[in-house]
């Protein structure tokens, strides 16, 4: 059975670390296009609570999650969570 790892993406919102493909900044035109396409498909999850989008999380199910915390912060939580899971499994 696979361990489910959860990552806090701000304001009490959590995503499954196992499903995350990329954590990117929302400024570039291609990422803005991905956000627009996800909104049209009904696969956009806005977890910003009305704040400015600072990180875009893309999942293996083609869902796009918007977060109000920096991509570096999300990535750091991802790495720390992964290291903790590795230590706990040994």
Curated annotation (Swiss-Prot):
Pfam families: RemA-like. Signal peptide: none annotated. InterPro entries: RemA-like. NCBIfam families: MtxBflmRegRemA, PRK04323.1. Belongs to the RemA family. This is Putative regulatory protein cce_4590. The lineage of its organism: Bacteria, Bacillati, Cyanobacteriota, Cyanophyceae, Oscillatoriophycideae.
